Amino acid sequence: MSIRSALGPLLLALTAAPGLAANTAGLSPEMWQRVKGAEPATVDLAPTPSEMAPDRLSLRECVVLTFQHNAGFRQSLQQLVNARGSLWVADQRALLTAAARGEREQSPGGEPETNLSSGLSMRYNLTTGGSIVVDAGTGTQETLADIFTQQPSLVLSYDQPLLQGAGLASSTYERIRSARASLALQELSFFDSRQDLSERVIADYFGVLLAQGEVDIAKRAVDRAQQFYDISYVKFSGEGVVKPGETWIGQVAEIDVDQARLSWEQSKHQLISRHQRLRDAMDTLLLDVGFTPTGTPELTTVITYQPQEYEEAKLIPIALANSTDLGRLEINRQDGLAQLRIALSERLPDVIASVGVTDLGDTLRGVPVSTGWFGGIRMEVPLWDRQRSENAQRARRALEVLDQNTTATRDRVRQDVQQQIRAAVSSRARIDIGEQSVALAGKSREAAQGMYDEGLSDYLRVLDAENRLVEAERSLLQEQVQYFLTTVRLRKALGEDVTQGLPD
């Protein structure tokens, strides 16, 4: 069998050899599937003009639209696409090169000569460290007809390191492994940035709902203060509601009406401030989503309180198995092991085995030449090199530090889960107390109003009861929002996709 007939099947078999396994960063299969599932199938980075927000927005719609319009998120998409491209480049193992030369020369005392030559070379690098080289050439000819009609030369060779740079320490294997590790790191970073952006938009959305709720509370306070002022004025003046400054019936009556008026004005002042906070919160939400910060879309998702029970003993192992921080450290550990493997390989003798065959074809201008072959071993032994020894020591020290960082990170993951569980439990307890406080403050407000109407107390008692009711309503609303955001942070700490299961 000639080398031409054996070349095709050989290269096909080498090309079809299995590649490196995908880097899963030591994460659980469910978590890695979640990370991969968060990546978009297609990426369009073309700039788009700012758009107006729709008239109605749910929380789920806000999160989805954020991934389409947020400018900062596109940078994460770009980095992910770049990492994919780097792996595509690193995984190129076959290099194909074509060359041609044509010149006309005349030696001293000789006749002008035309020299034409062309060649095609292919090199295929194996992850074992070896390389297959195929060279085809025409030799030097005088006419183009000779180049196109002759049988070209063919050289097939195979070089394989036996010690230094062999196997997992080969440059080809390490190049592909490093690119896949970089892609895995970027995939984890993309998932984290997606989680962070989702958490921020959810917090913005509920910040608007909180501001809207505080506006509603302030409106009710203004209405109650105005009604009480009207009642006080009619009660002690015997006339209809008019502007202050008239002659009052007694100093006590004048003080009560002034206090009622002051309470009314303070309530209106609070309402103006709450409206400003609502506008600021809405602008923040629209900017984070990627919309023009104008308009006031209706937010259709409402604040709901759904208490849940959490078991720390069950959640901590889940968080450890799904932690992207631990996943990054595992990838860094794989990089450190690779550096140690390469450093130890560099201390070994450089032994390369070579074998090949040659077929010159008709390139020697009609001189018949039979097929030849070659084979041998080349060896270089490093006798003394401080740098190679130091490289191995540095790799070992880096791994030791990395192991300590892994231990500390595992402790931080546990602490984060414990902290979020404590926050959820505390928030749930404060909500229960807040609901009772609102009910008691409402009763106290009604009782104070009744005592004032019967002349058993002055307005200061009513004012104090009113302030307590407003504060209780506001605190309860804040705790309900805080509880929901705490559950979002807990899901994030557990490695769950916070975009899933959002209320409509």
Locate predicted features.
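Sec/SRP-type N-terminal targeting helices
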Residues: 74-78, 91, 127-151, 162-188, ...
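Short terminal targeting/anchoring segments
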Residues: 458-478
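Bacterial N-terminal signal peptides that target proteins for export
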Residues: 1-8
